[in-house]
């Protein structure tokens, strides 16, 4: 039986890493994942060895000339194609589970709504890169722009995080639009960590029940 593919999305500072860690610990402690199957935690960009090099090209602030918007889009697509073929598809085919910090939603939100690139072009590239692989459920951890800025105040921003408030606002609007899809679940990430993970657990139980 094919494994489950769970994705976490959201603007920077939304708490994806924290909730992924909480969910993974909980899943490992339960019998929701079939016996003899495992849980793989990954991320985009940078989920593979090649992807780590691409991540550096995309996010490194020390690079003198940043990639233009189309180059950036193609690099993300290359990272995703490698990620799907090397990690995600083989893992799911074995019946194992995958939790990914970002997937296609981020490209649509950041490059589509943020960079204002053509959405149809992005979707066409995603179709090539993903080869039909899609999440069983995507959690959008939703926080206001001001909260994102506050949470990131004491950490060093990467190249994307250094974009201005207007860019971040457009990205947030993109995520809001994407979360209307039935496979997305929007969760307020300004609630307590306990409440957030409780909602996530509830949705995972529903996912298993309706399989």
UniProtKB/Swiss-Prot annotation:
Keywords attached to this entry: ATP-binding, Kinase, Nucleotide biosynthesis, Nucleotide-binding, Transferase
Keyword Ribosomal protein found: no
Reactions catalysed: dTMP + ATP = dTDP + ADP
CDD domains in UniProt: TMPK
Sections of the chain in a coiled coil: none
This protein's name: Thymidylate kinase
Organism domain of life: Bacteria
Pfam families in the record: Thymidylate_kin
Single annotated GO MF: ATP binding
EC annotation from Swiss-Prot or TrEMBL: 2.7.4.9
Entry similarity comment: Belongs to the thymidylate kinase family.
InterPro entries tied to this protein: P-loop_NTPase, Thymidylate_kin-like_dom, Thymidylate_kin_CS, Thymidylate_kinase
GO biological process: dTDP biosynthetic process; dTTP biosynthetic process; dUDP biosynthetic process
One GO location term (cellular component): cytosol
Keyword Lyase belongs to the record: no
PANTHER family: THYMIDYLATE KINASE, UMP-CMP KINASE 2, MITOCHONDRIAL
Protein residues bound to ATP: 10-17
HAMAP family xrefs: Thymidylate_kinase
Job of this protein: Phosphorylation of dTMP to form dTDP in both de novo and salvage pathways of dTTP synthesis.
Encoding gene (name): tmk
PROSITE patterns: THYMIDYLATE_KINASE
């Amino acid at each position: 039986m094919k494994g489950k593919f769970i994705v976490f999305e959201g603007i920077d500072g939304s708490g994806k890493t924290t909730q992924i860690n909480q969910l993974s610990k909980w899943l490992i402690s339960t019998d929701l994942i079939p016996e003899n199957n495992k849980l793989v935690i990954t991320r985009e960009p940078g989920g593979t060895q090649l992807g780590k090099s691409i991540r550096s090209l995309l996010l490194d602030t020390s690079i003198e000339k940043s990639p233009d918007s189309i180059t950036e889009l193609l690099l993300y697509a290359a990272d995703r194609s490698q990620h799907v073929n090397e990690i995600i598809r083989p893992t799911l085919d074995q019946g194992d589970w995958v939790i990914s910090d970002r997937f296609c939603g981020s490209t649509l939100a950041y490059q589509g709504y943020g960079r204002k690139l053509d959405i149809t072009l992005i979707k066409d590239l995603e179709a090539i890169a993903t080869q039909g692989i899609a999440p069983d459920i995507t959690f959008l951890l939703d926080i206001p722009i001001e909260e994102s800025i506050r949470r990131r105040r004491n950490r060093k921003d990467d190249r994307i995080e250094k974009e201005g408030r207007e860019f971040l606002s457009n990205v947030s609007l993109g995520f809001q639009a994407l979360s209307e899809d039935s496979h997305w679940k929007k969760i307020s990430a300004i609630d307590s960590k306990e409440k957030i993970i409780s909602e996530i657990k509830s949705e995972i139980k529903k996912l298993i029940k309706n399989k």
